[in-house]
């Protein structure tokens, strides 16, 4: 099974990529949508270029895609890139930080990836999953969402148990202050987060 992983650089897409590898599948590339607009219903906005470093560390190509973030258009922009109609050079330049050194082994995917399926790290967003599923139908490939509706605590514990280095990159909920920024999610911090999640009623896994 040859797959592309939709990678935002976040914990869930990283876990989805690991899941595919553990199944013995060939990860042909990581695909990252960089939003040039102010908002997106589909894709993560901040820090997505880190996915290029993840691709380099995995030894797989990276396919950067630009999107204006407009509702209903953004999934079509991703689909167009997966069909091989993508200015990968421009997408790389606009996605990459000038302050970063490009890894020597980072390979930029050119053209359409030869895949049987697309793997995504969607947890609970019907909006996102439905649109990815429909896109995959149009492309003639299978859509896999291995984390779909996983229980929050179990999912976070699995990340810690399997050695993922998860860092909190932003906070936008009551109960979480700037002291959490950059903090690693481990057994201790996860227990603290779980208590705060109960009190302030946010999702432990960061969804929504």
Predicted regions and their residues:
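ATP-dependent adenylation/nucleotidyltransferase module used to activate substrates
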Residues: 1-169
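A conserved mid-domain beta-alpha-beta active-site/ligand-binding segment of alpha/beta enzyme cores
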Residues: 170-208
